[in-house]
Amino acid sequence: MKKRERVFAAMKNQPVDKVPSYFTMHFPREVAFGEAAVEEHLKFFKEVNPDIQKIMNENLVPNMGSIKTPDDWKCIRSISLNDKFMQDEIELVKRVLDRCDMDAYNIGTLHGIVASTIHPIEPDYGYMPVRQLLVSHLRQDKAPVLDAMKRIADGLCQLAGKFVELGLDGILYAGLGGERFLFTDQEFEEYIMPFDKQIMNACLEAGGNNILHMCKTDVNFDRYKSYKGLYTDR
């Protein structure tokens, strides 16, 4: 079987000649952007020869201002494909696809709503403190925070669709928020789930497929039961 044929068969629970596989990593920062990133991806794909080739995304939602209170989230403006960080990732995808094995199942990395919401201020606080800050601000005054998250989600929907338009088979959606020690089940359902589903639906509507990556430790996988139909075993 060819690589893409093998992956699609596995997604449909059909017989395969072997289990399709892939490996992925965050490349060192010095080769994470621009031409260096293109070459590093191609080298990695050639050495690993995976069925699924995932293009990494280190082009993150940028800082838009200091955020110390829930009201400060109003500084997060709408994002679109015209933003430089999106243009940079689009260019990376184009250049990798121009030279990579198109017999493979090719996907882009789309950081989910939680990751993309904290990325603008993560350098200011550190990874765990900024995640705790997001939870705290949502509990204190959810309206301005959810408004900011909606603006981010709308932009991510555009990127998901663009990935498919460029020729990718879909996205790896990197979901956060399922960990028991941060959001409660009810908070996840209200604050996170609607945006996750909005973005994953955008990929499906564009003709792509989703691989759902549920990140981190102590994840309550039951929170994702209603996502069935949005990811690749549908």
Model-derived regions: residue spans:
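Short N-terminal amphipathic alpha-helices
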Residues: K46-M64
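Active-site loop segments of alpha/beta catalytic cores
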Residues: M1-E35, E40, D51-I55, L81-R234
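A short glycine/small-residue-enriched secondary-structure motif
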Residues: E58-I76
